[in-house]
Amino acid sequence: MAKKNKKKEPLQVVVPKFDTLKLIEPLTKSQEKAFAAFRKNSHLCLSGCAGTGKTFLAMYLAFEEIMSGKSKAEKIVIVRSIVPTRDIGFLPGDRAEKESTYLYPYIAICAELFGDPMAWQKLVAKKQIEFLTTSFVRGITLRDSIVIIDEMRSEEHTSELQSRFGISYAVFCLK
C-alpha cells in the first residue's frame, strides 16, 4: 500500500485573549467621579465599604493606563500589609507561601478583567504586575510604576510608602 502524500496545513497562531482588557463602565456616581479624577490626575484615594469595588476599579484604571501605550509606567505594583486583621494564627511556609494567601482577590480581578483564569500568572511572567508587602518594602524605590496601596489601615505604613515612590508613577490609596 502506498501512503498518500497529504499536504501539511500551516499551524494556526492563536492570539491570547489575555491581552485584551475587558471594557468596564462606572456603575455609580462615585465610580464616575473616580474615573474622571484618575484621568485628570494620576493619584486617587478611594474609600468605601467592603465590596464597593475599590480594588477592582483601581486595577482596571491602572491596566487601562499601562495598556494605552501613552503611560510612562511599565508595571503595576500592589502593596498591602499582610498583618491579619483577625488573628488566624501562624501561617507556615516561606515568604511566597505566606503572601499567596493575600493574592486571591488580585488573581480573581485579573481573571475577570482579561477573561483568562491564568491572567495573573501571565502578567507576573511579563513583569507587568508585582505584589509587595509593607513588611518588605524598605529600601525599594518604586520607579515607572502605578502603585496600588490596598487595605491602607496604618498611618505608619502609609508614610513609609511615600518615601518609596520614584519618577513617573500614579498612586491609588484604598481604605
PLM region descriptions:
Residues 50:
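The conserved Walker
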Residues 1-13:
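Interdomain "pre-motor" coupling segment immediately N-terminal to P-loop NTPase/helicase cores
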Residues 23-40:
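N-terminal pre-P-loop "Q-motif" helix
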Residues 127-148, 153:
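Conserved RecA-like ASCE ATPase "motif II neighborhood" in helicase/translocase motors
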